[in-house]
Amino acid sequence: MVVNYNDNGELTMGGTSLKTIAQSFGTPSIVYDEDQIRNQIRRYHKAFEASGLSYNISYASKAFTCIQMVKLIDEENLQLDVVSEGELYTALEAGFDSKRIHFHGNNKTKREIQYALDNQIGYFVVDTLEEIDLIDKYADSNVDVVLRVNPGVEAHTHEFIQTGQEDSKFGLSIKHGLALNAVNKVKATKHLQLKGIHFHIGSQIEGTEAMIKTAKIVLNWLASERIEVSLLNIGGGFGIKYVEGDESFPIEQGISEITEAIKETAQALQYNIPEIGIEPGRSIVGEAGITLYEVGTIKDIPGVNKYVSVDGGMSDHIRTALYGAQYEALLVNRNEKANESVTIAGKLCESGDIIVRDA
């Protein structure tokens, strides 16, 4: 936990009163602990260094991005994943090297593709066969692409954040031949060069079982089809702790288990291990952040519920309404033990605009 109470009973982060931050910047405000973010990044670096494999870490900017965050990512020697023109623009405005930027997304627009080409990004992560044609059409020089494959593996997480199952909207199915079709299609283009293979099976993954299973499927497919690549990106989705009972992904142990499985599988297949890439986002910033709200009205329905309404809602905090995510709520201005259970509600005109149930 990155927050604690000081002697005055005020909640603090990094020694700074969150009450003071709320008064200075207003609410809702999202506040991050920079030291915690850097520490998480360095844990990933050390875990991969211990594996002995060639690796790269890309920050998934959809987790949280702004110019200062991009600069921090640059300082910590990470690459950057973007999924929109806006995220790419932010990265470029921060002075981030475009060659270290990768463009994701299952439905990139022509404008986004052209913008990325104009700024000579590192590579595109291709999600559909049609996208191969689009990139090749607008390119006027060689472009690296990484194919996102669908391994047909269900991660043990909420159905809304599973992305590797057979009926997912993401990726090129290995089982149904789309992945191999994409490899051959890239080879037949004028400008595209196949740099690597990518997979991502979901979010809030606490263990390594599904990730290892997927890595083995992909390596077996690569070896059986004699596809040589310089990058194997195993995605992200590493889980974090939101409330008591949640388990954070064990970075050191988890990376060790995954990389050892990759080594053993590749050796058995006599397949050369390419550079291994990962894309943590939430697991870098999620436990380092807190959202500040100001309490407004309080509605007590005797024997039914007590609603404490705040000055934000599902417009800035969608996860509770979207798939029942759970959160912990703390008072900023006093350290008192809870003596009742309430529902923290947003201010939007939706009955589902709830931030925390049973706070």
Where in the sequence are the language-model features?
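A charged N-terminal "starter" segment
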Residues: 1-124, 129-144, 180, 184-193, ...
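Short clusters of hydrophobic/aromatic residues that line enzyme substrate/ligand-binding pockets
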Residues: 3-5, 11, 170, 344, ...
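A cross-family glycoside hydrolase active-site/sugar-binding cleft signature
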Residues: 58-60, 81-83, 102-104, 125-127, ...
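Active-site-proximal loop/turn and secondary-structure-junction residues that shape catalytic pockets
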Residues: 63-65, 86-87, 107-109, 128-130, ...
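Solvent-exposed alpha-helices and their adjacent loops that cap or buttress functional pockets
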Residues: 93-96, 117-118, 137-141, 162-164, ...
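Active-site loop/helix belt of alpha/beta enzymes
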Residues: 152-297
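Charged (often Lys/Glu-rich) extended helix/loop segments that serve as interaction or gating elements
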Residues: 271-359
